Structures are given as structure tokens and as C-alpha cells.
Amino acid sequence: MGIPLTWMLLVMMVTSWFTLAEASNSTEARRCSECHNNATCTVDGVVTTCSCQTGFTGDGLVCEDMDECATPWTHNCSNSSCVNTPGSFKCSCQDGFRLTPELSCTDVDECSEQGLSNCHALATCVNTEGDYLCVCPEGFTGDGWYCECSPGSCEPGLDCLPQGPDGKLVCQDPCNTYETLTEYWRSTEYGVGYSCDAGLHGWYRFTGQGGVRMAETCVPVLRCNTAAPMWLNGSHPSSSEGIVSRTACAHWSDQCCRWSTEIQVKACPGGFYIYNLTAPPECNLAYCTDPSSVEGTCEECRVDEDCISDNGRWRCQCKQDSNITDVSQLEYRLECGANDIKMSLRKCQLQSLGFMNVFMYLNDRQCSGFSESDERDWMSIVTPARNGPCGTVLRRNETHATYSNTLYLANAIIIRDIIIRMNFECSYPLDMKVSLKTSLQPMVSALNISLGGTGKFTVRMALFQSPTYTQPHQGPSVMLSTEAFLYVGTMLDGGDLSRFVLLMTNCYATPSSNSTDPVKYFIIQDSCPRTEDTTIQVTENGESSQARFSVQMFRFAGNYDLVYLHCEVYLCDSTSEQCKPTCSGTRFRSGNFIDQTRVLNLGPITRQGVQASVSKAASSNLRLLSIWLLLFPSATLIFMVQ
């Protein structure tokens, strides 16, 4: 059974159509260089074919752009605009719309997206389809791109005033923009004259000797250098009232308010008044000031206080941002000084917690608080940096000494409510000074030295157990073996430490407590160590406020069991003297004269194993030492310096 003729004809027609279509978009070529720039070259054996790329139409040798936007079925832009491009197309939206992933356009809300609207700061942005509007607030004028205020449209305390070179009207605080009237003749005590304030218009502040605020009572005629003096018929406002309206009256012909005009008054945070004045209704009329009013009534206000006016009187009041609701929010200041510890609390914050009459004390109630001021008002309390006073407790480890105490707060001397307790402490790294203060009975020596003039310097000298110089020997005497080392430290306390340094000029040992004993063993002489004794090491001398040396323990030849140490010290002015010794090479040793008024003494030190009692030898020193320990925690030497 053969294929019907009708089907054969149909197949031939379709095949012919595809062949023609293919031939219309591609062409055989001899080489690829014959293909158009927007065509693709394919090589199949010996056949080279040029075919136009997608988005182009032609025979491959010549290809032209196909306009997909010309017919709706060749692009998929729905409610967006189709824009033809070489070989393709794109969908575009009008201004105010945004293209979605589905290639449709949606409205842009310029009012909700930052940076898209240009409305004035006071205007309200209103979104519309494809656009937006700017609307000025009620009482303001303008196109929304710029809004100007009008009288009565500003918030309380502000006024509609011109600003900038173009004089556009904006709401401003008149306390920051006013003119000054300084004429002394405005005083109600000034006599006759014929001044007239016809040219006044705007906000003004009165300053100078004539007074700083308007008179509040009727002023006699022919005063204030004018015929009919003008006065404020009413009281001045308080700071919380903002801008108030008052009547200014002019006294003439036995009528205290013969003429009147309305003015505005405001109490400003800086402790002064400003007045929105208008020209008087007649001439000669002028505004008068009260000479009893004074400037600077708020100069004592601190940074955490506002200057406010109550019934025409200025006073300082804590700012609202000082208010707290919990003790944990208290701002404190802890100062860990060399001799004292001070704890301070902000007074305004205490008042916001209800402490109007603060009663502050420490573990020892005899140590109570006091008021002090700098930029702020504080309630402070001080305790010596020592164990015991004010109930202060000392804790000590190998590296630090820590003093702690408890601060108690009450609202009065008698207590019915819960009192507040605040623990505080200061930690000090152990050095020679701190270690002496934290020792119960360090081996020290004391001597007062005066260098004519004024200025007191204290020098201490102590014997330590190790090269760290943080553990002083305790007690009135020390027993050591000849293998042990003596670590001696001297330190300058107080005075101008940036200028003066401590120099040990002569340090020596004697077998008796007499520093002038002819039997002397010099450890340091003429500021330099004894070179024959290799155990001597000067750690520091003439470089800072402290000086240190060490030497191995020894005994004197003969029937001597005790050793006493003596050091002559000197305060060297580093700004004008060479203080650090130069000890290299052979040096002449004088040591003939030692100023005993500059000598500190330590001892006795006895050799371990000696059974002889040293109590008698130390008794006189112990009695003297016990007296000094009540005054100083270490050996002291006082310098009086000009």
C-alpha cells in the first residue's frame, strides 16, 4: 500500500519551507571571514556556514538588529516600557517607579526611603503615584521645599525670627539671638532727658551699670533720660514659663500707665532676661531699668546645674539629666593619693535620690563627709591611707597593699530608712614608700633638716630584707649573719619631685650609734661606692626621688658586735646641677667633713649568733623611734627649701 499523494505533497512543502527559512538566516561561505560581525561561523567538513546570532536577522553575510519591541509577542515587558537594544531589549520604568523581578513597574515611596525626598525639615512628605508632595505645617508658609514660620506658629519658648543672609524666617530661641542695650542712662536713678526708643524692634537684653532688667514699679516722670519712663507692669517670668506677654506702661501726667504697649519677656538659662520690644506709641518715651538688679547672679552655677528664675530671683538648680533612680547609677570619684584616699559622690545625683541633707561617714563615724566644688558639686570624705584610721583595713600580698573602707549614706543624723553602704578600696604597688607605710614597726630613722627659706621636704631611710626593697626589717634592731646582705633605701617624699633628686653623698658604718665615731667604714664616699669592697652595689643615686645601695653584712674588728649605718643626703637641683655621680677612674676621697644635720641613722644591726643583749644599746633609739612612728610611718628627714 503506497503513501497517498496528498501526504507526499505536504511533506515536500514543509521541507521546502524549512529549507527556505534556514537559507534566509544562514548562507554557505568560502571562509569564516566572510561572516558578519553579528553572525556565527560553523565549519562542517568542507562546508562553512554563516548564521546570524539571536536578536539579529539576515543571511549571515549581512545581519541586522531585530526590533523585539515592534511586536508584543517578542518581548515580555508587561506594564513597563520596552527599549530596543542591539541584539536584545530591556524593560524600563518611568521616574517614580521601580522595575520588579517580574519586569513590571511598581511605585517608589520617596517618603519612606531615606535620601529620595527633598522636603524641608519642617514639611511633611506625602507619597503619590509616581511622585511625592511636600506640605508645610499649619501656620507655616512655603512650597514644602522650604517652609517659613509665621507669628505664633513656633513651639513654646521659641520665636519666629529671620536667619541667614536671605533673612528667611525660622523658629529660634531668642536667648541665642538678641541685641544688647548698654546705656547707663536707662537707670531709674538717672535724671531728666529726652531720649526716645522709636527705633527699637526685636529682642533685646539690658546690660551695664544702669541695670540688667526692666523696672517693675511705676517710675517717676522725667527719669531714665526721658520724659515718660516706661516700666514693666507685671512680674518677670520664671525659667519654666518660656516666653510671656507683659504690658509696658509709660508714666506721664500723674498716670502710671498713660501710654502702654505689649512686649514679650523670657528668662534665659544664662541667668538674664530678654525683652521683645516695640517702638513706644509716642515720643519721648524710653524703657527703664532697675539699678538694683545685678549681673552674674548665676556665676556660681556648676555644669550640672541650670540657672532658673523664681519670682524675679535667680538661683541654681540641678539639671534634669542629673536625675537617677537607683544607687547603682551614682557617679563617684575615687582618688588614691600617696597619703590620703578620697571618695566623692555627685551632689545633684544624691538630691535626685532624696538625699537633701546628706550625712556621710565611714566605718569610724568620726570621719564624716563634707561639700566641695569644682565644675560640679560633690559630697566627699577622706581617710588616711593607713591601717586603722577611719576604720580603714589593710590587706597586703607580695605585690600590692590594698586599703578598704565602707561609705555610709543617710538623709539625716537620725536614721529610720535603710542606709546605703558603698565599699571602696585603693591598691598600691609595693615600693619603698608603700612598704614602709604598711609595716607595723619598720626599722627607720628620722631627722629634720632645714635649708633656709620655705618649702618642706621629707626624706626617709629604711633597711630592707631583699633587693626588691618592698619588705622592710621590723623592730628596733635586726640580727643578721655575715653572709646576709643589707639593703638600704632612702626616699624623698613631697616637694617638687620634678626638679629635685636625692643624692647620697656619704654613707658609712660605725660600731656605735654615734655618727661621729672616729671608727668608720665608708660604703659610699663623695657620692661613689667603695671600690675595694666588691659586695657594695649602688642601685640608684642622684637620679630620682629615691636612692638605694646594698652591702654584705660584716663586723668590726675588735670587741664590737653591733653595726650602725649612717647616710649623709643632699637634695640636688637637676635643673642647674650635675646630680648623677661620675665614679669611673681614680678619685680623691675627702670625707673629711660630713654635715651631721643631713645624716640619717639606722641600727643597731647585730651579728647572728652573738648572745650579748642589744636592748640597752637600742633602748634610747627605740624610745626616740617610737615617738617618730606616731608621726611618720618611716624614717624622715625634713628639708626647708626656697
Curated annotation (Swiss-Prot):
Residues 173-292 are annotated as: D10C. GO terms for biological process: antibacterial innate immune response; apoptotic process; apoptotic signaling pathway; autophagy; calcium ion homeostasis; cellular response to stress; cellular response to unfolded protein; chaperone-mediated protein folding. It is found in: Apical cell membrane; Basolateral cell membrane; Cell projection, Cilium membrane. N-glycosylated. Proteolytically cleaved at a conserved C-terminal proteolytic cleavage site to generate the secreted form found in urine. This cleavage is catalyzed by HPN. Disruption phenotype: Mice suffer significantly more frequently from urinary tract infections. They shown also spontaneous formation of calcium crystals in adult kidneys, and excessive intake of calcium and oxalate dramatically increases both the frequency and the severity of renal calcium crystal formation in mutant mice, but not in wild-type mice. Residues 1-24 form the signal peptide. Residues 28-64, 65-106, 107-148, 293-324 form the EGF-like domain. The keyword Transcription regulation does not apply. SUPFAM superfamilies: Growth factor receptor domain. Residues 455-465 are annotated as: Internal hydrophobic patch (IHP). GO terms for cellular component: apical plasma membrane; basolateral plasma membrane; ciliary membrane; cilium; endoplasmic reticulum; extracellular space; membrane; plasma membrane. Disulfide bonds join 32-41, 35-50, 52-63, 69-82, 77-91, 93-105, 111-125, 119-134, 136-147, 149-160, 154-171, 175-268, 196-283, 218-256, 224-288, 249-257, 298-307, 301-316, 318-348, 336-426, 367-390, 507-567, 528-583, 572-579. Glycans are attached at residues 25, 38, 76, 79, 233, 276, 323, 397, 448, 514. Residues 431-454 are annotated as: Flexible ZP-N/ZP-C linker. Detected in urine (secreted form). Detected in kidney thick ascending limb epithelial cells (at protein level). It holds the Pfam family EGF_CA. GO terms for molecular function: calcium ion binding; IgG binding. Keywords: Cell membrane, Cell projection, Disulfide bond, EGF-like domain, Glycoprotein, GPI-anchor, Immunity, Innate immunity, Lipoprotein, Membrane, Repeat, Secreted, Signal. Residues 335-430 are annotated as: ZP-N. Residues 149-172 are annotated as: Beta hairpin. A lipid is attached at residue 618 (GPI-anchor amidated alanine). It is a lipid-anchor; GPI-anchor. The ZP domain mediates polymerization, leading to the formation of long filaments. The core of the filament consists of interlocked ZP domains which assemble into a helical structure. Each ZP domain consists of an N-terminal (ZP-N) and C-terminal (ZP-C) region connected by a flexible linker; the linker allows the ZP domain to wrap around the ZP-C subdomain of the preceding subunit. The heavily glycosylated N-terminal part of the protein (containing several EGF-like domains) forms branches which protrude from the core and are be involved in pathogen capture. PANTHER family: ENDOGLIN/TGF-BETA RECEPTOR TYPE III, UROMODULIN. This is Uromodulin. It comes from Mus musculus (Mouse). The gene is Umod.
